[in-house]
Amino acid sequence: MRQLSTQDADFDSQLTELLAFETVNDATLLTTVDDIIARVRHGGDSVVLELTQQFDQHPATTTQALELSKEALAEAFANLDDVVKSALITAATRVKTFHERQVQETWQYEDELGNRLGQKVTALDRVGIYVPGGLASYPSSVLMNAIPAKVAGVKEVIMVVPAPKGVLNPLVLAAAHLAKVDRVFTIGGAQAVAALAYGTETIPAVDKITGPGNKYVAAAKRAVFGQVGIDMIAGPSEVLVYAEGEAQDRADWLAMDLLSQAEHDRIAQAIFVTTSAQQLKEVAIEIEKALAELPKADIARDSLKNRGVLILVRDREEGMAVINRVAPEHLELSVDHPDALLNSIRHAGAIFMGRHTPEAIGDYCAGPNHVLPTSGTARFSSPLGVYDFQKKSSIIYCSESGSKPLAQTADILAQHEDLEAHARSARYRYQ
C-alpha cells in the first residue's frame, strides 16, 4: 500500500493518478452495451430470455418463468433464521424512519398581486431497482432502494436481480418482501437495464432506474438516460478515513475500517489521511496483520495495492483540503470532536462522525441511504433518497387583476427577445 505526504514534490500528480478511474468509457464495452440495448428494445422478451440464458446460465425456458411470485418472496422471509429476520427488520425500520423525514410536500403562497404560486410534488408512477445478484448478493441494497421509493409514494417498484444458474440468496428475496417490492425478475446486466427502460411484453417500462451494478450495468444506465431517469453512474466503492493521532485512536480499528472497503472489490479504494506520522506507521502494520487472516485477503490486498493510499498531512487544514479534493463516497472522521470538522467538509457522500461510527453501520442499519455518489461526484451529487422518487411541477395561477402588471412586464421582455407572439399573448391580458 503506497504512502504519500503533502510535502512530496509530486503529491498533487500522485493523488490525481490515484483518483483517476473510469470504467464506462471503454469503447468495446460501450459497443457491447449498445448492441444489447438495441436487441432488447426490438426483440423484447425473447432477447431478454436468450441473454439471461447465455450470460447467467439461467434454466428458465420462458420470460414468465424469470418472474418470482409474491408467495416465493413471502416464503423466503418466513424461512429466515429468527436472528437474521430480526436484524433485517431492524435495518428496514431504521431506513424507513430516516427516509420519512425526507418527504417533500406540495406548497403554495399568494403574492402581493393576489396571484397564487407554488410547487406540486408528485411521486413517480413506476421505478426499477437493480440489485446485484448471486449467492454473494446484498439484501441491504434492496432495502436502500425500495424503501425510499415506497416512502415517496411510488405506485409500483420493479426489482431486477441476476440469478446465476437460477440461484439466489434467500435473504435478497426476504428483503424484497419486507420492502414491499411489487414485482421481481431474475435478470441482470445491460439486458435488465434495457428491459426496464423500454419495456418488453412481460417486463413493464419504468420511469427511473436506481441501484448499483457492474460496469455493464453502469454503462447501460448511462446509455438509457433520457428515456428514463437514473440515480447515478456508480463507480467502485471508496472510503476515506481521517484521524489525528489522538490518544483514543486504535490503529486496529482504523485498519479494519479501511479493509472493510478494500474487501468489496479489487478496484475499491481505501484512503487513510492523518496528521501523525507515527499513526500512519501503526495503521500500516495493523493492515498487514489483518490481511494475514481475513477471508477475502486476496481481494483486499489487490485493492490496497492498486488504489489504496496512506496520506500524511501537516495539519488539519491540509487534511480538510485533501478530503474535499477526493470528495469521498464514505468519510470517517475518527477524531475526539468530529462536529468541529463538519463545517469544513464540503464534499462527501456520507460522513461518519467519531470513532464509534464505522462505515459498516451505515452500510446496513444506521438509516441513511448507502447508495452514495462515487468517483468524486459527491462534489455535485447527493445520496439516494425519497427526493429521487418524487418530481415537482410549478403551480402558477394569476387572477384577472394580478395578471395585468405581470403581462406588461412579459410583453416588454418578449419584444426584446424578438418573440412577437409571446408579446401579443401577454398584451391581450392587460389591454
Swiss-Prot record:
Enzyme Commission designation: 1.1.1.23
Matches recorded under PROSITE patterns: HISOL_DEHYDROGENASE
Top enzyme category: oxidoreductase
Binding site residues for Zn(2+): Q261, H264, D363, H422
List of residues binding NAD(+): Y130, Q191, N214
Cofactor remark from the record: Binds 1 zinc ion per subunit.
GO terms of biological process kind: L-histidine biosynthetic process
UniProt entry tagged with the keyword Zinc: yes
CC per GO annotation: cytosol
Gene Ontology terms, MF aspect: histidinol dehydrogenase activity; NAD binding; zinc ion binding
Cofactor(s) the protein needs: Zn(2+)
InterPro entries to which the protein is assigned, alphabetical: Ald_DH/histidinol_DH (IPR016161), Histidinol_DH_CS (IPR001692), Histidinol_DH_monofunct (IPR022695), Hstdl_DH (IPR012131)
Signal peptide interval: none
Annotated active site: E329 (proton acceptor), H330 (proton acceptor)
Keywords tagged on the record: Amino-acid biosynthesis, Histidine biosynthesis, Metal-binding, NAD, Oxidoreductase, Zinc
Family: Belongs to the histidinol dehydrogenase family.
UniProt function note: Catalyzes the sequential NAD-dependent oxidations of L-histidinol to L-histidinaldehyde and then to L-histidine.
Name used for this protein in its record: Histidinol dehydrogenase
Species this protein is from: Psychrobacter arcticus (strain DSM 17307 / VKM B-2377 / 273-4)
